[in-house]
Amino acid sequence: MNEVCLKLSDLFVSSGWGGYDRGRAPQWAHPRAQQQWFGAIAALEPFLRQTLPNVGGELPGICLTGPAPVLKDAVLVRNFYQGIATPWEEFSPWPCLAGEESEWSAVPPMREIPLFPQDPLAEEQFCWLMTPQFGLLLLLGKNEQGLAQFYWTFDPEILQQAWLSLQARLKYGLSPDLSLLQKTIAAFNFPQPDFRLVTYFGQLMLDYQPNPYNLPPCQEQESAEPSPDVELLQALTHEVRTPLTSIRTLTKLLLRRKDLSPEVLKRIESIDRECSDQISRMDLIFRATELESTPLPELVVPLTVTSLEAVFQAGIPRWQKQAQRYNVNLQAQIPHSLPQVWSNPSLLDQVLGGMIEKFVRNFNGGGEINLQITTAGDQLKVQFHTQSVHQANPVRALGELLMFQPQTGCLSLNWDVTKNLFQLLGGKLIVRRRSPSEEILTIYLKCEQRTVPVANYDRQFTMV
């Protein structure tokens, strides 16, 4: 089988791993699998800190993930090579030419593994991790019934097969690090793990399961059909996104050329940026229509312990660049240390980005956005104070979900839908309008206060 056409879940299915629990309703397969995935990711860093006390030796660890990085601990980030599987339209060209063999630096880089259009790996979330003591694969994919399934394994054979699949993609992407990765992984030699490691990680995953909820038994009932308006909106967002993705793929290819003038490159970068903004907007609208059309008994967004500090560190520079293009100044007052909150980090970043875009495109002649984060009892208070130089551009309702700005042609989610999204994210949004040019938006998010028990294992494991 061509490794580039292989999904990682195919490795588990072909190895005889079980399918979904037939005692559960199929509509709960995805939220249940997501819950298990979030629990495993939350358990990973505590597990690595406990089992790899001497991080920083001759052979650093390797962590290949998709579609986003999973390691955020500063010590682990310094000592793990990280590769991120990235759709081709989001891929940034390698900073050095293929064939150049790099060396491990003091802080290993975070490289991108380009996924070409239609690559089935883009449909999965995974973390492939290798150290001298053990290897681990975490995967949110699909089972043989086509339903969402969470898999995890320390099995060296499956880890080796997964590496062959990832290695093929690195070859096609002309990774400058491939030779060094091959040598390092050959030195690790896919070790057989100590059984205590497997037991310990399994216990940690149970300890870190996010916001448990009861999944109902399977009941035969007809699913509510989405309204024609919702179906039309979903179809339109798809039709808009598809050509924009193609255009963005072409701009990425053009940006790799060395024979273009600075002025041409500047214009291509502008096209790429506008396509990216539109794609993000369409993604959020599509996600919102999907959630709004889901019947209440089935409407679940799995929540997990979320580093709000990481969300804002990644988002604020991006939002500031976006604001500057519309002559808007975004100032942020972020405390040095923030408690973690219960939320969904991926959707939270998406919704916050949509709010920022709504602000900056609604301002008439520029303006200011002040972001301030404070604690309020057992909650974090995130407040946006927005002020336009002139009266904000008028908007009008477009159906039950959207707002439309006739002057700019901008589409955005209305405040009712945005409030519903924050409620699903474990928070609350309050919108207060002081004047036609000034608004204050306050978001409350529940702080994570539990103490997670840690199994009583030795800090160091003697491997045999």
Swiss-Prot record:
A Pfam cross-reference name: HisKA
Domain Histidine kinase: 235-449
Annotated catalysed reactions: ATP + protein L-histidine = ADP + protein N-phospho-L-histidine
Xref: InterPro entries: HATPase_C_sf (IPR036890), His_kinase_dom (IPR005467), HisK_dim/P_dom (IPR003661), HisK_dim/P_sf (IPR036097)
Residues with Phosphohistidine modification: 238
EC code(s) of this entry: 2.7.13.3
Protein name according to UniProt: Sensor histidine kinase Hik34
Lineage summary: Bacteria, Bacillati, Cyanobacteriota, Cyanophyceae, Synechococcales
